[in-house]
A protein has these predicted regions:
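Acidic/polar, compositionally biased interaction segments
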Residues: 1-280
Length: 280
């Protein structure tokens, strides 16, 4: 049983099931010669056309699945994902996609939104609606958006009308978007404006909802992700003493919490938080 930040290799209670694809090769291992632009358009089509895994059948799929209860990886080598899925010998660490799926039971009624970022990509579909998509790239747009102009458009600063139009059409990061910066995550603050709050959604306690989470690394090098959950209208238990950003709980499906190295860059989180039990 191999356990990593990307999940455990044995089916375990209350987890989402992750499947790993390498778009650089066919199921039989032949190179696809996809360019980065072609990869981005595949990503965009997948996320905006119903998350249909049949669209990915032409690519190599790892035989190993992983079972994850939270989505939190401080900056690490992009090779860690193929390694976790047991295919590092076959897969170079770029242009890979991992999709986690399951159903979760709402632990309480209320309005929530995901908060986070992916380096390069993290997107979430909850109850068949795209509610989160932010990182170095936005999957729904199929574009790199870690730039001052995209951040300005998301913050609804004057101008940038063409970019604002694209964001409105995608319907996830409709300006103005809330950014949170944490004093322990300087690199993400400088490059991506921090982490972002996604689209609000309502749930009823006890109801069960489908959830899908997509993560991806595009050029290779480093990978990182954070997925937190904010209850809209609820005051946070604590705030970053330097930036004032709320310290939020992780989105998680069991009681386990990661133990990040506090000496390295990381997004802080509140270790106490509700658990969204996964229902088989």
């Amino acid at each position: 049983d191999a356990t990593s930040a990307f999940g455990t290799s044995k089916p375990s209670g209350s987890t989402l099931v992750g499947t790993f694809y390498d778009t650089k090769q066919t199921p039989g291992g032949r190179p696809t010669n996809l360019s980065q632009d072609q990869f981005c358009s595949i990503l965009s089509r997948f996320v905006t056309h119903g998350w249909d895994e049949k669209d990915l059948n032409r690519f190599y799929k790892s035989p190993q699945q992983l079972y994850a209860a939270q989505f939190y990886v401080p900056r690490t080598s992009a090779n860690e994902a193929p390694k976790a899925y047991g295919c590092a010998d076959k897969v170079k660490p770029s242009r890979w996609i991992a999709i986690y799926r399951g159903k979760v039971r709402a632990p309480k009624s209320g309005t929530f939104r995901f908060v986070g970022a992916g380096d390069d990509v993290i997107a979430v579909r909850f109850n068949n609606e795209n509610v989160f998509d932010y990182g170095w790239f936005q999957a729904s747009l199929g574009k790199q958006t870690a730039s001052t102009k995209w951040i300005a458009a998301m913050e609804n600063k004057p101008g940038y009308d063409d970019l604002k139009k694209e964001l409105k059409t995608a319907g996830i990061n409709v300006p103005p978007v809330t950014f949170y910066k944490y004093s322990s995550s300087g690199h993400w603050n400088r490059t991506m404006g921090g982490v972002v709050a996604g689209k609000s959604f309502k749930v009823k306690q006890g109801n069960v909802y489908p959830i899908e989470i997509l993560i991806s690394e595009i050029p290779g090098g480093e990978f990182g992700m954070t997925l937190l959950l904010e209850e809209v209208g609820m005051a946070p238990m604590s705030k970053d003493p330097k930036t004032g950003a709320p310290i939020l709980p992780l989105f998680r499906t069991n009681y386990g919490v990661p133990k990040p190295d506090k000496n390295k860059e990381h997004v802080p989180f509140d270790e106490i938080g509700i658990v969204w039990e996964s229902i088989k």
